[in-house]
Amino acid sequence: MLGSTGSVGRQTLDVVRAYPDRFRVVALAARGNIALLAEQAREFAPEIVAYTSDDPATQAQAADLLPHALHGVAGLTAAATHPAVQTLVAATSGLIGLRPTLAAIRAGKTIALANKETLVMAGHLVMAAAREAGVDILPVDSEHSALWQSLRGEHTAEVRRLLITASGGPLRKATLEEMRAVTVEQALAHPTWRMGQKITIDSATLMNKGLEVIEAHWLFDMPYDQIEVVVHPQSIIHSMVEFVDDSIKMQASLPSMHLPIQDALSYPARWNRAATALAHPLSWADVGHLDFEAVDMARFPCLRLAYEAGRRGGTAPAVLVGADEQAVPLFLAGKIRLTDIAEMLEETLARHTVIEDPTLEDVLAACSWAQDEALRLYGEPAAARERTSE
């Protein structure tokens, strides 16, 4: 598992604990939470432990608590490709999991994918490698898991559209003027999910949903014109598939990441959860009603930008990811407004010359360029930005 100390990683280990006779943990890797990683290593006794942080204090702690731990991307790759590994849970955040995941695919490992950047930035490379190696890419995100379950046994040619649901986040009802003045605390107050700060802000801007649209394009080989986002504040219906005969299949459950994680790890079977600590059945009577709303692109321009970057293809999605990686921390630090995030992304995309069929190095270089360009934009007076874009 890559990202074992993060939210998805910890919940994956909950699934492992619920079914101890079905799993053996071969490798655990994380970024810099050494104390928790060491605790996990004591509990699950993996053959490999790895971490990626370059912080000197973290490295000193690792030398004390995990003296045999591997370090860096090489350590993650060794974990992902270990001969005893059958399934890799790719749950790191950001770009660092891309190379190890590709290496695992080429080594013939089944991939349970929870890392968005892998497909958003390099979907053409990842899916081509998976086809060549005969490897399954199993989605862990709740929305893509719902689509995957609804598409099983169906013919893609009979699909009219994929409908990805969005809770709408903490700013679903906010006016554009209110969004300009929103505080960090307000943007982090997600009504449904408890996640890290970066992904919570991406949920508030609907950038997260835009990245999911690009992911769905690659996972299910579906044109962007056949992928739509609909707001569903209860987060009970996780996504839907509409077919050419007007029928719709959907997957519903109470919001919990344990279920899509388990579905990926148990595939093609379904395991009975009734006797486990994960049991979380849905009562329709308690739900009462379900609501759906259209997305207001004027208030959530990040979703529009994701569609545009996805349709443009090439290195454009990598630029979107790179610019967002810089813009969100600036907002969290109180240096820009929430609405400035979309403006920074749009301007960075406008300044980029897209490479149509990029290599992995092209993708990573484009993301790095976008990170630098977004920071330059932040330090650039508005008048200068306007002159540059003319």
Regions found by a protein language model. Give the residues of each.
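Catalytic, metal-anchored helix/loop core of enzyme active sites in primary metabolism
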Residues: M1-E390
